[in-house]
């Protein structure tokens, strides 16, 4: 599997990637011959050759269908897994190539740092007039917080992810130019071992993961990857500042992490008060265990003897205090360590951590106490010639404690507004609660939200469940500290009454501090196009409400608003979603400023472009002026977590890119663009008319039947991807009730990728028809928002395939002739205008590396898609009861996901 079409040209810096792909492709061939047969490998080669020829000649998929249809499920599954394995090694090779390129930049010694890194950001800031004093004043305001979620978009199981890490490690080791032939042979053998073990591991688990499984999955990235790279991130920043400005200020904490795993109740009956408590306990154990192990490693390093060097009086005094506090632990210290005060203090610090784990006497009451002990050691080492005798290693632990605390990641809780509303209606005995407008409900809720009257308790499941949740949060605040809790997010928030409802429920649940305030940041999530449009009015009403304003004063007069990229796109199409999000941020910032409140945004992005995915640096550059202001809180979902944080070097790069982008957007935001006043009405028209086209398509009679037949949504719903159901419980199969993740996932599998582009062509054409073509070209050239939008659409279009999409569409029978012509015509219109406005002859002409990556994969995805259509038709003929066909279909889903590097 190592031939390439002559038209695939690698740039000189990417030639090592070409060599790796060829070598690893040949290794996949050897694997297939060994694990299946030489005849099987020959068959794979024939299919591959046909697929490439089809692409080169633009022939219809029927040329592949003749070779692939009618296979036994087991044979089909083997063929799919063969191509999936190729994608696996190509993906790994590309990740390792990113590490190679990063090292080349670092070794080059040139004045051109790697783009989007910290060195690049700081040099750009200095060139724009930012002084070291200004930078030092801004650093304490920087707060970057990736928030990991358990959305069911990760189509690769944990056992396979671990083997991928082994393969990556062997390739990274092989980058060392000093490796001997024997060592290189050992690297290759390690890769082959992990690859073979992957082949012998089923692609997906036979059972749906539990919340505990999802917590363990996310915990893997937090404790095994990010825990290790956090200190390196700060060291890189220090080096970049020193190299740029000549000196380094004391760095505050800039990074922390959040999680939804165990706290996201929206539509998931498996998440409740018990999972909230269990998650916080598990995360506490995990991070304290890491601290104990690291202190144990430091013990042997910090062996300084008082007969040779001194220690500070403060450290000696702390050691004596701890001996009195923990006499049993002090008695266990080895006599031969009696002249090693650092080691003795280390022993007692570990004892305090164990007491913290056990909730025993002598426990640390807060992470700040552990930080204080570590700082004592650092100060003593620095004062006594110990900078090169352990100071560096101790400071690394200090950075970890500052970043992870005793909680590892802040836990958010999320629930849908209607759940709260039903509970309050039942508690108040108001059967017409939904019929009342927001103002009426807010007036009723005011006394309960203010704590002037107790919200009645009622004995029903909904109220009991919510009471238990808020009681768990109150207990968690006492047990784990305020830093362990993130925000309480209200999904499908529509008005201020939705927020006051949560405030009233929190009081009833006992989440009240000593001052009588509710110590909880309540965050409305605006998800639909209409809610984005009405979000400014909602926030204005909320901030003008005296009860809520009193609550906000206790929270530092800072309000967070979450913006939903997924459901807004599903609701009105991607153009309306993107523009609605952009306008909402501008209007919300203006409203909050007028009312004297600092507004921060929480971006609910997914992995796909349709759900807000894309490069953080470009997204922040395109964001409205003032919308960052030092703060970035963004969800990291599904396959994005693996892609960005699965490898330490790439996790470091991701953190650098986010931090650098926040620094640039905050310290030197783009200058105001007076032409935006002229551009906005044009974008209003594009969004409005694209929404009309999109809703006409998805709102047509029998569309949902078409969707369910023309995509493998029924297979996706049977897969064991996550603990949350694909639609909200107790609701029908209408599009509004289907979650955005399976919606995007299904269309990506069918290669039509409808959510990522449909309606855009109609919107652009409407603007042209209204006489705005020159304005659109100006916008594409000079407006980062519009340029980024078009670039993202171009990328989505490049990953789609109309011929394959037509095969899927024909599964819908007579509905095909009604819906597919609409897809074909809108696609042609969208492609034409995207290329015209970007002034490109072909899609992704501006990004040849990405274009090459997609072209490398497409011929290998095609056979899987053709098989998928055949298997889907046969499986449905059994009413979905043939398990062998289902297993083959699941393999197809995983294979396409590996190929397009995207799920939901």
Swiss-Prot record:
Protein's organism: Xanthomonas euvesicatoria pv. vesicatoria (strain 85-10) (Xanthomonas campestris pv. vesicatoria)
Listed GO MF terms: magnesium ion binding; phosphoenolpyruvate carboxylase activity
Family: Belongs to the PEPCase type 1 family.
Name the UniProt record assigns to this protein: Phosphoenolpyruvate carboxylase
Cofactor section: Mg(2+)
GO cellular component: cytosol
Top EC class for this record: lyase
Function: Forms oxaloacetate, a four-carbon dicarboxylic acid source for the tricarboxylic acid cycle.
EC number, UniProt record: 4.1.1.31
Catalytic site: 151, 570
Top-level lineage group: Bacteria
Substrates-to-products reaction catalysed: oxaloacetate + phosphate = phosphoenolpyruvate + hydrogencarbonate
């Amino acid at each position: 599997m190592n031939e390439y079409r002559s038209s695939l040209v690698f740039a000189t810096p990417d030639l090592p990637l070409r060599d790796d792909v060829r070598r690893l492709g040949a290794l996949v061939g050897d694997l297939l011959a060994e694990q299946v047969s030489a005849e099987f490998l020959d068959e794979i080669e024939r299919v591959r050759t046909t697929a490439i020829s089809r692409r080169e000649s633009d022939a219809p998929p029927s040329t592949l269908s003749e070779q692939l249809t009618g296979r036994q499920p087991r044979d089909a599954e083997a063929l799919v897994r063969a191509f999936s394995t190729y994608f696996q090694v190509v993906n790994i090779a590309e990740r390792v190539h990113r590490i190679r390129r990063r090292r080349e930049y670092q070794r080059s010694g040139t004045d051109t740092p790697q783009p989007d890194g910290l060195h690049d950001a700081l040099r750009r800031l200095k060139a724009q007039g930012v002084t070291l004093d200004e930078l030092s004043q801004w650093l304490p305001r920087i707060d970057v917080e990736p928030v990991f979620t358990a959305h069911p978009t990760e189509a690769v199981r944990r056992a396979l992810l671990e083997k991928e890490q082994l393969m990556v490690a062997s390739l990274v080791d092989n980058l060392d130019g000093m490796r001997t032939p024997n060592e290189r042979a050992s690297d290759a053998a390690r890769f082959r071992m992990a690859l073979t073990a992957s082949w012998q591991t089923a692609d997906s688990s036979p059972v749906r993961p539990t919340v505990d499984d999802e917590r363990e999955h996310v915990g893997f990235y937090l404790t095994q990857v990010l825990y290790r790279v956090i200190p390196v991130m700060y060291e890189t920043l220090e080096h970049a500042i020193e190299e740029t400005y000549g000196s380094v200020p004391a760095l505050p904490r800039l990074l922390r992490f959040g999680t939804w795993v165990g706290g996201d109740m929206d539509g998931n009956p498996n998440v409740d008060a018990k999972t909230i408590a269990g998650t916080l306990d598990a995360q506490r154990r995990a991070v304290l265990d890491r601290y104990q192990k690291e202190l144990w490693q430091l013990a042997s390093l910090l062996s300084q003897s008082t007969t040779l060097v001194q220690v500070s009086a403060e450290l000696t005094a702390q050691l004596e205090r701890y001996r009195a506090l923990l006499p049993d632990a002090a008695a266990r210290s080895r006599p031969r360590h009696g002249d090693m005060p650092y080691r003795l203090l280390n022993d007692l610090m570990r004892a305090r951590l164990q007491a913290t784990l056990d909730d025993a006497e002598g426990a640390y009451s807060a992470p700040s106490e552990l930080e204080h002990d570590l700082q004592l050691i650092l100060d003593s080492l620095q004062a006594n010639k110990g900078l090169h005798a352990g100071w560096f290693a101790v400071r690394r632990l200090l950075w970890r404690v500052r970043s992870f605390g005793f909680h590892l990641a802040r836990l958010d809780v999320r629930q849908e507004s209607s759940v709260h509303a039903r509970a309050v209606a039942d508690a108040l005995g108001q059967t017409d609660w939904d019929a009342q407008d927001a103002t009426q409900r807010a007036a009723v809720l005011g006394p309960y939200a203010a704590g002037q009257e107790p919200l009645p308790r009622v004995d029903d499941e909904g109220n009991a469940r919510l009471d238990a949740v808020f009681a768990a949060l109150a207990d968690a605040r006492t047990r784990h500290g305020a830093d362990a809790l993130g925000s309480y997010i209200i999904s499908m928030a529509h008005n201020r009454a939705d927020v006051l409802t949560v405030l009233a429920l929190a009081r009833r649940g006992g989440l009240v501090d000593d001052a009588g305030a509710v110590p909880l940041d309540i965050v409305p999530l605006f998800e639909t196009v209409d809610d984005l449009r009405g979000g400014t009015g909602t926030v204005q009403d909320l901030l003008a409400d005296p009860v809520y304003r009193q609550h906000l004063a206790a929270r530092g007069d800072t309000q967070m608003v979450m913006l939903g990229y997924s459901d807004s796109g599903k609701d009105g199409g991607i153009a309306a979603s993107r523009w609605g999000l952009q306008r909402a941020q501008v209007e919300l910032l203006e409203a909050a400023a007028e009312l004297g409140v600092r507004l921060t945004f929480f971006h609910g992005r997914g992995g796909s472009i349709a759900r807000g995915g894309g490069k953080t640096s470009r997204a922040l550059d395109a964001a409205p002026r003032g919308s960052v202001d030092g703060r970035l809180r963004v969800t990291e979902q599904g396959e994005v977590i693996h892609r960005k944080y699965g490898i330490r070097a790439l996790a470091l790069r991701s953190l650098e890119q986010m931090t650098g982008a926040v620094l640039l957007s905050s310290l030197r935001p783009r200058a105001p663009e007076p032409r935006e006043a002229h551009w906005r009405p044009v974008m209003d028209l594009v969004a409005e008319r694209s929404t009309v086209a999109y809703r006409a398509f998805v709102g047509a009679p029998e569309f949902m039947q078409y969707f369910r037949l023309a995509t493998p949504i029924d297979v996706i719903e049977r897969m064991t991807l996550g603990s949350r159901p694909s639609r909200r419980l107790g609701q029908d199969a209408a599009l509004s009730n289907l979650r955005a993740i399976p919606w995007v996932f299904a269309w990506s599998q069918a290669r039509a990728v409808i959510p990522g582009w449909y309606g855009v062509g109609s919107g652009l054409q409407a603007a042209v028809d209204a006489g705005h073509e020159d304005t659109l070209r100006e916008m594409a050239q000079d407006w980062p928002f519009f340029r980024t939008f078009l670039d993202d659409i171009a990328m989505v279009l490049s990953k789609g395939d109309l011929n394959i999409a037509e095969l899927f569409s024909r599964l819908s029978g007579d509905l095909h002739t009604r819906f597919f012509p609409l897809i074909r015509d809108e696609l042609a219109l969208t492609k034409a205008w995207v290329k015209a406005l970007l002034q490109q002859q072909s899609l992704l002409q501006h990004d040849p590396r990405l274009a090459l990556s997609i072209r490398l994969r497409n011929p290998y995805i095609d056979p899987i898609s053709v098989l998928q259509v055949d298997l889907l038709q046969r499986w449905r003929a059994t009413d979905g009861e043939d398990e062998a066909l289902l297993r083959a279909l699941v393999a197809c889903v995983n294979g396409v996901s590996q190929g397009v590097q995207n799920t939901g």
